[in-house]
């Protein structure tokens, strides 16, 4: 989610700046720090109906993928792989109205008790896969919800989250069960700001019915247009269009209410996914192994006894 007035909030600027420095990516515009706005406006990123709140600002739907192990043991580090695919050749409309590379971000909602693995617990091989990504908890009370981004999509359309599983022997609130894991992933900027206003990565429509009487190109650095519409009663309404979208109507054209005046510049989108993993009890695995060994042993014993019985029968027949 994005906004143009991020600099008004010192805390948000500090957090966004730290994230950008940490990942070595210093070209992220403040308007692209979308995870911050979900954290600011929603206590929980997943609503009761299962919808992740990032969809409030990122209106287009795009696919995402989530891969987790089928089962994990307690107090172990494992990988959760997030994929946010998109065509790397395309560019989006930046906040300044100019073409820009797409960034990606994600929110991973883990079961309670699961959390980001400490650095000293992450194997070197996994650290290589993680790269320079910086993950942060959604809040101090929700360490099981992790956010990342915005980061360059050309480098991180696939992200590896290092996760530490809980130990029910130490945390009595956790049980050996089958758990859901939820993902929200995005590529590109949003179409709506948290206050409900449109970004320049959106379609702009006619506020009234009438005739387009003038289309004026603005001379500001960010570009844009002023489209004047004259209604049937003779009133004029001016629709200001920021730099980025292209005007698709012409002077003298009759338009209706909400008819698009511009193209849709958005090339990104948001998607949700989910997976399941089992927090496996080691004692169950040990019990299963013992059962299998006992079963195999019994089968071998029966085969040997059968062969021994056949030998005795054969000897009696020969006698």
UniProtKB/Swiss-Prot annotation:
One of its GO terms (biological process) is photosynthesis. It comes from the Eukaryota. Binds 1 heme group covalently. Residues 1-33 form the signal peptide. The keyword Transmembrane applies. InterPro entries: Cyt-f_TM (IPR024058), Cyt_f (IPR002325), Cyt_f_lg_dom (IPR024094), Cyt_f_lg_dom_sf (IPR036826), Rudment_hybrid_motif (IPR011054). It is a single-pass membrane protein. Its main location: plastid. SUPFAM superfamilies: Cytochrome f subunit of the cytochrome b6f complex, transmembrane anchor (SSF103431), Cytochrome f, large domain (SSF49441), Rudiment single hybrid motif (SSF51246). Its cofactor is heme. PROSITE patterns: CYTF. Belongs to the cytochrome f family. Component of the cytochrome b6-f complex, which mediates electron transfer between photosystem II (PSII) and photosystem I (PSI), cyclic electron flow around PSI, and state transitions. The 4 large subunits of the cytochrome b6-f complex are cytochrome b6, subunit IV (17 kDa polypeptide, petD), cytochrome f and the Rieske protein, while the 4 small subunits are PetG, PetL, PetM and PetN. The complex functions as a dimer. This is Cytochrome f. It comes from Oltmannsiellopsis viridis (Marine flagellate).
């Amino acid at each position: 989610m994005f906004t143009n007035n991020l600099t008004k909030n010192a805390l948000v600027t500090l957090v966004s700046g730290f994230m950008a420095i940490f990942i070595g990516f210093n070209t992220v515009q403040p308007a692209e720090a979308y995870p911050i706005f979900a954290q600011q406006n929603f206590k929980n990123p997943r609503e009761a109906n299962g919808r992740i709140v990032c969809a409030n600002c990122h209106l287009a739907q795009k696919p995402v993928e989530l891969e987790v192990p089928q089962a994990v043991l307690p107090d172990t580090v494992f990988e959760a792989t997030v994929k946010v695919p998109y065509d790397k050749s395309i560019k989006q409309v930046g906040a300044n109205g100019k073409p820009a590379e797409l960034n990606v971000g994600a929110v991973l909602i883990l079961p309670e008790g699961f959390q980001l693995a400490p650095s000293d617990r992450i194997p070197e091989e996994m650290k290589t896969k993680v790269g320079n990504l910086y993950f942060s908890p959604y809040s101090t009370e929700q360490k099981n919800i992790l956010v990342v981004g915005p980061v360059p999509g050309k480098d991180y359309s696939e992200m590896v989250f290092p996760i530490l599983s809980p130990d029910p022997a130490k945390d009595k609130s956790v049980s050996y069960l089958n758990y859901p894991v939820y993902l929200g992933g995005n590529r590109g900027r949003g179409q709506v700001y948290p206050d409900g206003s449109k970004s320049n990565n959106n379609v702009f429509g006619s506020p009234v019915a009438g005739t387009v009487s003038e289309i004026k190109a603005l001379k500001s650095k960010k570009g844009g247009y002023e489209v004047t519409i004259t209604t049937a009663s003779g009133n004029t309404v001016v629709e200001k269009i920021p730099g980025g979208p292209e005007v698709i109507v012409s002077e003298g054209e009759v338009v209706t209410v909400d008819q698009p005046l511009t193209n849709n510049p958005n090339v990104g989108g948001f998607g949700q996914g989910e997976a399941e993993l089992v927090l496996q009890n080691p004692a169950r695995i040990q019990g299963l192994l013992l059962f299998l060994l006992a079963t195999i042993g019994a089968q071998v014993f029966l085969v040997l006894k059968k062969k021994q019985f056949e030998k005795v029968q054969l000897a009696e027949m020969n006698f």
